Design a protein with these regions (language model features):
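Short, small-residue-biased leader/transition segments that mark boundaries at the very start
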Residues: 1-7
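Duplex nucleic acid-engaging cores and interfaces of nucleic-acid transaction enzymes
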Residues: 18, 35, 115, 119-129, ...
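Short, conserved non-catalytic motifs in the polymerase core
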Residues: 60-75, 97-123, 139-152, 173-174
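Reverse-transcriptase-like RNA-dependent polymerase core
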Residues: 56, 86-110, 123-131, 158-167
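Generic, well-ordered alpha-helical scaffold segments in large soluble proteins
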Residues: 22-25, 29, 55, 59, ...
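N-terminal alpha-helical targeting/anchoring segments
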Residues: 8-78
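A short, contiguous, amphipathic alpha-helix enriched in charged residues
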Residues: 74-89, 193-194
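Conserved catalytic palm subdomain of right-hand nucleotidyl-transferase polymerases, strongest
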Residues: 62-71, 115, 154-193
């Protein structure tokens, strides 16, 4: 999906569930250095939960069951009110279920482990992501492209190519730290972020 379409779809969904003004406010407050309290009120708000369902439902993986055997379809048959209450209940004492482990092939023929969370865990985590994302995005470097909303490797390549052309650079170094994400010290990483 192109970044313009991605942005348009995300905005349309957030506006439909009346969450966009909240997200814009979180972004602006974070940009100005605000310290946040009471985020659980926003995270567990019915409209944020409904938006999380909509966003997860749009993922191909929503039809793949975790260790509990449930998919998005098993939640879609519930009444909206019952579904919202089920997710809100999770926030009182949230403990994620075990993650289903599968191996998927990499382009080089080797296998890569993939974890598939239970669908309820995906919804809960999406609720948290939707609220934390505007807060964090306000602090991130504008030209950081990895694992960011509506950004891609193509965006990074385009930016790097422009820099190389403008500055008459002739060399590119490709660095891939094997297993970086699995081995990074998260305490140090969090200190760097905040």
């Amino acid at each position: 999906m192109g970044s313009e379409m991605c942005i348009r779809d995300r905005l349309r969904h957030a506006e439909y569930y009346d969450m966009q003004k909240t997200f814009d406010s979180l972004y602006a407050d974070s940009k100005s250095g605000e310290v946040f309290g009471h985020l659980m009120d926003i995270i567990s708000a019915p409209n944020n939960i409904k938006l999380a369902f909509r966003n997860i439902k749009g993922n191909d993986g929503s039809h793949t069951a975790g260790t509990d055997g449930r998919t998005i379809e098993s939640l879609a048959v519930m009444s909206e009110d019952k579904f919202v209450k089920l997710i809100q209940k999770q926030f009182r004492r949230y403990e994620p279920k075990a993650v289903k482990r599968v191996e998927i092939p990499k382009p080089n023929g080797k296998m890569r482990p993939l974890g598939i969370p239970c669908i309820i865990d995906r919804i809960v985590q999406q609720c948290i992501l939707q609220v934390m994302e505007p807060i964090c995005e306000a602090k991130f470097y504008e030209h950081s492209y990895g694992f960011r909303p509506c950004r891609s490797a193509e965006n990074a390549i385009s930016y790097a190519y422009g820099l190389a052309q403008r500055n008459k650079l002739h060399y590119v170094v490709d660095v891939d730290v094997k297993g970086f994400f699995d081995n990074v010290d998260h305490r140090k990483l969090l200190k760097q972020i905040w």
